[in-house]
Amino acid sequence: ARAFNARLVEGQVVRLEFDAERQDGYGRTLAYVYLPDGSMVNERLLLAGLAYCFYKTPNTRHEQRLLAAQRRAMREGQGMWRSWNEKEARYTGNAATRRFHRQGCSEARRVSARNRVTFTSRWAAFLAGYSPSRECLPLGHVAR
């Protein structure tokens, strides 16, 4: 992903578009990155299967567009989606945070009944636009 991104942006004048927040809690810049041809780098990484959607409310301006790109990459078997391998059968999602957890994860047990969503696979969770919890790392072969 890093090399692909570098090939896209190196030597280019890019435009940054900010959403509701300009930085995350760690001081990192949150932005949509556009190339001179108008294409969105974030979307190109998703289409290549080199990234997955990781929403951070309230920064959801392009969430449907980006999720559509992720779903297309999944459907076409691009990048990380090419040789998908499921190891576990059930995951718990949190509708409020759009994160999913392994069933035995302490964070999964804390998800309220109102926000609890059960997925039969990681694939189903990603397809629904959820991203993996960083507490229990239900990633399988997907690198962070």
Regions found by a protein language model. Give the residues of each.
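Small beta-barrel nucleic-acid-binding modules, primarily SNase/OB-fold domains
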Residues: A1-R144
